[in-house]
Amino acid sequence: MQDQQIINPISQSQIPQELSENVILSSVSDLYDWARLSSLWPLMYGTACCFIEIAAMIGSRFDFDRFGLVPRSSPRQADLIITAGTVTMKMAPALVRLYEQMPDPKYVIAMGACTITGGMFSSDSTTAVRGVDKLIPVDVYLPGCPPRPEAVMDAIVKLRKKIANEDVRERGNLMQTHRYYSTTHQMKVVPPIHTGVYLEAAARKSPAAALGAGVGEDMTPALVAEAEKEEA
């Protein structure tokens, strides 16, 4: 009677070479992360001069389509927003609304010094937000004034690595417990500047008396003079 060969279960499994080259073992979470990092859809959103570098990336010289980036004009179709340029107090509510309309999971790249700290406007400006992370959570900070397209591509590569290492089941908890908010801005609703009644304003019909006295002649507005001619 032949002795049966005993295979040690602790030893390395005997997988044929053909099978090992055609089968990939992974998890659903890793597959989901790979799909997301390979098809980031950025929102076309720019507030200042940094957006010029984003426009340069769309051209054939840098060709950011090879990263799977598909520019979208609607926040409901995007999962990445690159805040390129200065964010003002008046633009802050619109930015927060755009971020809230993006489906989860969503990512933010703060591009440029003005976006990260306020930049040249951080010392004496009364309208610039000192850091977009006071409004929305930021995943990647990209300093520069403005950053070169190569730097933007490096930030996208780092974001792809971050997505590859995260677990989709933990991202919701991470975004809730590790927020970057440091200051609550009082974003008050203000009336619009252009009301459509500029020509009917009192300053247009009757200028200040001091202005006429300083010039030394009658300062009747042209519109009022034309109306008097038509009535005559």
UniProtKB/Swiss-Prot annotation:
GO terms for biological process: aerobic respiration; electron transport coupled proton transport; photosynthesis, light reaction. It is a peripheral membrane protein. It catalyses: a plastoquinone + NADH + (n+1) H(+)(in) = a plastoquinol + NAD(+) + n H(+)(out); a plastoquinone + NADPH + (n+1) H(+)(in) = a plastoquinol + NADP(+) + n H(+)(out). One of its GO terms (molecular function) is 4 iron, 4 sulfur cluster binding. Keywords: 4Fe-4S, Iron, Iron-sulfur, Membrane, Metal-binding, NAD, NADP, Plastoquinone, Quinone, Thylakoid, Translocase, Transport. The keyword Metal-binding applies. Transmembrane segments: none annotated. The keyword Thylakoid applies. InterPro entries: NADH_UbQ_OxRdtase-like_20kDa, NADH_UQ_OxRdtase_20Kd_su. Its EC number is 7.1.1.-. It is found in: Cellular thylakoid membrane. Binds 1 [4Fe-4S] cluster. [4Fe-4S] cluster binds at C49, C50, C114, C145. Its cofactor is [4Fe-4S] cluster. Pfam families: Oxidored_q6. GO terms for cellular component: plasma membrane-derived thylakoid membrane; respiratory chain complex I. NDH-1 shuttles electrons from an unknown electron donor, via FMN and iron-sulfur (Fe-S) centers, to quinones in the respiratory and/or the photosynthetic chain. The immediate electron acceptor for the enzyme in this species is believed to be plastoquinone. Couples the redox reaction to proton translocation, and thus conserves the redox energy in a proton gradient. Cyanobacterial NDH-1 also plays a role in inorganic carbon-concentration. Belongs to the complex I 20 kDa subunit family. NDH-1 can be composed of about 15 different subunits; different subcomplexes with different compositions have been identified which probably have different functions. PANTHER family: NADH DEHYDROGENASE (PTHR11995), NADH DEHYDROGENASE [UBIQUINONE] IRON-SULFUR PROTEIN 7, MITOCHONDRIAL (PTHR11995:SF14). This is NAD(P)H-quinone oxidoreductase subunit K 1. It comes from Acaryochloris marina (strain MBIC 11017).
